[in-house]
Each structure stands twice: as structure tokens, then as C-alpha cells.
């Protein structure tokens, strides 16, 4: 190791005459984290609307407790994932001393995303999306 702030050099297949071309892995990781955060915001908004729909139906709706619990757990996981992605974006991947910590954070975020996907599959299976259409059809307000 040359120094504590050593940067990683990668060789492109189609590199120019200079041979090695410097790639800023930190910039790549930051862009990836921002893109994941945008997807997380979209899912968060969708789950918030599902929660609103289920709550409007009331506690006598089918699977009410199950859906409310799953949606709240999903929302909480999404907040934790967002915080992890912010920390991943803040830390510099090019600094060797951060790489091990960033790898652990990235693994944790990936596991939490997988769990969130599974929870959202169950939310869809229990019919939270039907709750909105049922509430709209049974509403006494004219369209």
C-alpha cells in the first residue's frame, strides 16, 4: 500500500494509449446510492398510500391487522435503508480504510432490500391494492 488515501486504478478493455485509466469508484457508488434512494422513495410513497387505503377501510376489513403490520414494517425498513444509503454515499470508497466498513453497509442494505421486497410481495398477496378500489366503490361521495 502506498498510502492511506490510495485510489484504485482499473484497466479498461478499450483503454487509450496511456494504458491505465483512473476510475473514481466513489462517484460511481454515490450515483448508485442516489438511484436506489429514488426507487426507495417511490416504494415509500406507494406503501404510504396503501396504508392510508387500509386504514380508511377500518379494522373490520379482511386482513386489516396483517396488512397494517406488514406495511408499517416495510415503511420502517425503507427508512433504515435510506439512512444506510446516505451513509454509503457520504463515505469515500476510494479511501482504503473505508472500504471494509462500506462493504458491510452495502451488504446490510442489500439484505434489508431483499426483506422489504418479500414483505411487499405479501402486502400485494393480501390485497392491499384491492382495498383502494373497494373503498372507492363503497364511498358515499359522488364522483
UniProtKB/Swiss-Prot annotation:
InterPro entries: Ninjurin
UniProt entry tagged with the keyword Membrane: yes
Residues binding cholesterol, per UniProt: 104
Residue spans, topological domain Cytoplasmic: 94-97
Keyword entries, A-Z: Cell adhesion, Cell membrane, Membrane, Transmembrane, Transmembrane helix
Stretches for region Helix alpha1: 26-38
GO cellular component terms, A-Z: plasma membrane
Gene Ontology terms: biological process: cell adhesion; tissue regeneration
Up-regulation conditions: By nerve injury; in Schwann cells.
Subcellular location: Cell membrane
Location of the region described as Helix alpha2 in the Swiss-Prot/TrEMBL record: 39-58
Parts of the chain on the Extracellular side: 1-61, 128-143
Membrane topology value: Multi-pass membrane protein
GO MF entries: cholesterol binding
Subunit: Homooligomer; in response to stimuli, homooligomerizes into filaments. In contrast to NINJ1, the filament is curved toward the intracellular space, preventing its circularization on a relatively flat membrane to mediate plasma membrane rupture: curvature is caused by cholesterol-binding at the cytoplasmic leaflet.
Function summary: Its role in unclear. In contrast to NINJ1 paralog, does not mediate plasma membrane rupture (cytolysis) downstream of necroptotic and pyroptotic programmed cell death. While it is able to oligomerize and form filaments, filaments are curved toward the intracellular space, preventing circularization to mediate plasma membrane rupture. May act as a homophilic transmembrane adhesion molecule involved in nerve regeneration. Promotes axonal growth.
Domain remarks: Composed of 4 alpha helices: 2 hydrophobic transmembrane regions (alpha3 and alpha4) and 2 alpha helices (alpha1 and alpha2). Alpha1 and alpha2 feature one hydrophobic side and a hydrophilic side. In contrast to NINJ1, does not disrupt membrane integrity. NINJ2 filaments are curved toward the intracellular space due to cholesterol-binding, preventing circularization and ability to mediate plasma membrane rupture.
Family from the record: Belongs to the ninjurin family.
Name the UniProt record assigns to this protein: Ninjurin-2
